[in-house]
Each structure stands twice: as C-alpha cells, then as structure tokens.
Curated annotation (Swiss-Prot):
Signal peptide: none annotated. It comes from Mycoplasma pneumoniae (strain ATCC 29342 / M129 / Subtype 1). Keywords: Aminopeptidase, Cytoplasm, Hydrolase, Manganese, Metal-binding, Protease. Its cofactor is Mn(2+). Transmembrane segments: none annotated. This is Probable cytosol aminopeptidase. It comes from the Bacteria.
Length: 445
C-alpha cells in the first residue's frame, strides 16, 4: 500500500447517498468508482469489511483510494473514525496479498495507493503492519501440511522474527519429555515428526508487572488419530494449526510496531496421526500440571495440547492473563456459523477488556457460557478427568471448562475459531487484530 503517491488510474472516494431506502441504510454500494453508503455511514464494521473486500477483489491492476473522504464522513457526524479507518486499511492489506497458491498462473491482486492527511499517517502505517501479519497468518494457514509441520513452523517464525527484538525459545522433544508434558507428547505419539513448543516473548514495558500470554493450538494436521475422521471430515484439517499461526503473528506485529506491552505467544505444535505407537482410547496421560487425563477420544486432541501449553504459560512464564486461540469444536459452525467467533471467559473483567478490543478491531465475537455442570460428564473413574464424553449438548462449553482446569488460577479467555479460522477454503487470520488491540490496551491499564 502506497501513501500519497497515487497511481495514474481511477480514484475511489467515499460518499453518503440519500437515494437508498431505510433497508439499505447500512449497506455499502459500489457505483462507478465511488463507494456509497445509505442514510447512515457504517457502524457494522464486519459487514462493511466484507463489502469493501468484495469490491476491492473485483478491481484490476492499480487503484487509488481517497481515505480523507472516508474520514470526513465520520467527522461530519461526530463519530469516531479510528476503528473505521483501521477496518479500511485491514481490508486493503487483505486484498493486496495473494493467499498461498501453487497455481502456475496465480491471480494478480490489485495494488492500492491511498490519499490521506498527515495526521492519519501514523495510524495507517501502524495498521498496515498489523494487516501484513494477518496476511502472514493466512499464508501459513493455507500452506499444505506436508510443507508446514512443527519443525518447519518454528523455522518460519525464527526467520520472520529476525531483528524485531523478540526472544524465541523452542522446547524440543527431549525438553518436553524432561518437562513431563504428557498431554502434548501423547497426541504426538502417532507421528514420525517430533512435537515442539514454540515460545515468542516480547517485553517492552518495564513499568508493568502484567504479562499477557497468547496460547495457540498448533495441530499441523489432524487426522483424528486412532479415532480417525471419516468421509470429508479430514478435508481442511491443515487449518488445525490456525491458532498457533494467529498468536505468533500477533506478537510479531506488536514487536514490529514497538508497542509498549509485555506479551508472549506459546504455540503447541504436533501432528495428530494414527500409527503403531499412537495413543488410544482408554490410555491415561499425565499433564504438565500433574493432573491425569483418561483418553476417551483421540480426536479431542486440541484441548490436550492446549492444556499443557496453558499450564506452561501460567507456571513457567508467570502470565497474569491467558488468551488461547484454537480451532477446537466443530459445533461452533452450528452455534455461530462463520459470522462470530465464540469466546469463553473465566473472568468478567477480562471479557469486558477483550470485547472492547474486538470492537476496536472491528471483529465480531460472542460470549458463550461456562458452568461447573458442564465439567461433570468429564469425570473419570480412573483419572482426574477424561478428555471427552458421549453425553450430548454444550460440547463447546465443556471443552472450555476442561481448559480452565489447567490455568493455575490465572484468568483465561478461550477463543474457539473452529468456524471462523477459514472460510470457503481460505485462511482468514481471524483475531490477529483483536489480540493486537488487547495487548496494546494492556499497556494503558
């Protein structure tokens, strides 16, 4: 994206129009190089983002966008324009980057130059960086699992982190064994490739004692293990590492923009495959925090690797708040579809702060319930817990309650991105913007 160096091509301006009816007042119309709004300018930012992305993707070659005209619409009605401006910049960077492809003739994306006042330049530059790391997460999400496995995932981020002032720690198989991370190691038993725990630390606020831990599920391919997925259910399981890509990309965005905050990403990385040594239903594994877990279903593996990573963030990294991101339960597609990401929180104050961050980022989230009753079906006669149950109902809430057993008293927010991580077979980099805003807010608390 170019700033104030316009192409010799048409310029898109934003304007408000009164020729649409009330039913169209929140819709975005694209007419002859102009982006027109109905009676009201957009406050439903997710819908606006979708409309703008759709418009930009239809454009060819080069395009100028007049952001000053956009800001003026909000100022004229005494509305805060910053979130709206962030959404526009996010939409532009989203469309400028080609998703992962191995086509011999990949689609050429539109190049965008923006016209903007100098007072908005810093915000635009900041959010262009965020958009670039959203795109990094998208690229990793779309990469086939034979090219992106735990060791390669680590290498990609080690390279991307060069010069950003972050500290990278990698726990390899021997380290995980020494640490007794039995849940992560149990999931890994069927794979020929070793597991990894990737830690990316960014500490840039010495005045604060707060550390935000972002924990990501990094199953680089999920076959279901011995409870193998059938039919079409194995398609798209390369996206089971989306949480790890998202949290790691977020920390790099914060570091690139030198945000005054303390944040650490923890990515639990492994494949979940069947094999002669794979864990089986009825096995009992010991978690990093010492709790024992009976395996009821090997396809409920995400909560296992997250449990060890969450305990590690609390015990070893001394996190004061933990947010985990995971493609955890397929039920989310029935509950919230691809519109909202489901959020579970052990703390109302933590939820309030997270919701504020999501609003600032323009990403739709919805809080779902946690209750001790949901945990009862996960009681085991032989271990402290079991990882799943045949009892119907509230499966997503039950998974969240399972994770809460490993937080060591630290406030936990669980983000289930099972239905929003990828849409129409393309990674979305969902929640990078929200997590970025949350970490940036923490610096001001």
């Amino acid at each position: 994206m170019k700033l104030n160096k316009l192409f010799d091509s048409k310029t898109v301006v934003f304007k408000k129009s009164d020729k649409y009816g009330k039913s169209d007042c929140c819709k975005t119309k694209c007419v002859e190089g102009q982006i027109e709004f109905g009676v009201k300018i957009p406050t439903d930012f997710p819908a606006f983002n979708r409309a703008l992305v759709t418009f930009l993707k239809t454009q060819k070659n080069q395009l100028n966008v007049d952001l000053d005209s956009f800001v003026e619409l909000y100022k004229a009605e005494n509305l805060c324009y910053k979130t709206a401006l962030k959404v526009v910049v996010a939409s532009i960077t989203f469309c400028e980057t080609t998703p992962f492809t191995m086509k011999t003739e990949p689609q050429k994306n539109v190049e965008v130059a923006v016209k903007c006042d100098s007072e908005h330049t810093s915000l635009i530059k900041e959010y262009e960086v965020v958009g670039n790391y959203v795109n990094m997460a998208r690229q990793l999400q779309d990469t086939p699992s034979d090219q992106l496995y735990p060791e390669e995932f680590v290498k990609r981020f080690e390279k991307a982190a060069t010069g950003l002032g972050v500290k990278i720690t990698v726990l390899k198989q021997a380290d995980l064994i020494k640490k007794k991370m039995g849940l992560l190691l149990g999931v890994n038993k069927g794979s020929e490739r070793e597991a990894r725990l990737l830690v990316i630390s960014y500490n840039n606020n010495k005045k604060s004692s707060e550390t935000l831990a972002l924990v990501g599920k990094g199953i680089t391919y999920d076959s279901g293990g011995m409870n193998i997925k059938t039919g079409d259910y194995m398609r798209g399981m390369k996206y089971d590492m989306s949480g790890a890509a998202i949290v790691c990309s977020t920390v790099l965005a914060l570091a690139k923009n030198k945000v005054k905050t303390n944040v650490v990403a923890v990515a639990a990385l492994t494949e979940n495959l069947p094999g002669p040594h794979a864990q089986r239903p009825d096995d009992i594994q010991t978690a990093y925090n010492g709790k024992t877990v009976e395996i009821d279903n090997t396809d409920a593996e995400g909560r296992l690797v997250l449990a060890d990573a969450i305990s590690y963030a609390a015990k070893d990294l001394k996190a004061t708040q933990i947010i985990d991101v995971a493609t955890l339960t397929g039920l989310m597609s029935y509950i919230l579809s691809t519109t909202y990401t489901g959020i579970f929180s052990t703390c109302d104050m933590a939820w309030d702060a997270f919701k504020k961050a999501a609003c600032c980022a323009g990403e739709p989230v919805w809080r779902l319930p946690m209750h001790p009753d949901y945990l009862k079906p996960l009681e085991s006669k032989l271990a402290d817990l079991q990882n799943s149950t045949s009892v119907k109902g509230a499966g997503s809430s039950r998974a969240a309650c399972f994770l809460a057993e490993f937080r060591e008293g630290v406030p936990l927010i669980h983000c289930d991105i099972a239905s929003t991580a990828s849409i129409q077979d393309l990674g979305q980099g969902v929640l990078v913007r929200t997590l970025y805003e949350r970490a940036a807010q923490q610096a001001k608390e």
